[in-house]
UniProtKB/Swiss-Prot annotation:
It holds the Pfam family Ribosomal_L32p. InterPro entries: Ribosomal_bL32, Ribosomal_bL32_bact, Ribosomal_zn-bd. Transmembrane segments: none annotated. It comes from the Bacteria. HAMAP family: Ribosomal_bL32 (MF_00340). GO terms for molecular function: structural constituent of ribosome. One of its GO terms (biological process) is translation. Belongs to the bacterial ribosomal protein bL32 family. GO terms for cellular component: large ribosomal subunit. Residues 1-28, 41-60 are annotated as: Disordered. This is Large ribosomal subunit protein bL32. Keywords: Ribonucleoprotein, Ribosomal protein.
Length: 60
C-alpha cells in the first residue's frame, strides 16, 4: 500500500484540490424566442444563432 513520505502542507493540499471545483453548464438565451439552451446547441424550438435550422414538431 502506498504511504506518503512527508506530510502535505495545507497550501499544497489546497493546490491539489484546486481542480476539483464543479463547473456550471454553459447556458445561453436564444435572442429570437428567449428560450434557454446549452451553448452551441439548438434551442428547443429549432433556432440556432438567431436562424431557424429545424422546423418544430407541430403540437397536435
Amino acid at each position: 500500500m502506498a504511504v506518503q513520505q512527508n506530510k502535505k502542507s495545507p497550501s499544497k493540499r489546497g493546490m491539489h484540490r484546486s481542480h476539483n471545483a464543479l463547473a456550471l453548464p454553459g447556458i445561453a438565451v436564444e435572442p429570437t424566442s428567449g428560450e434557454v439552451h446549452l451553448r452551441h446547441h439548438i434551442s428547443p424550438n429549432g433556432f440556432y444563432r438567431g436562424r431557424q435550422v429545424l422546423k418544430p414538431k407541430s403540437e397536435a
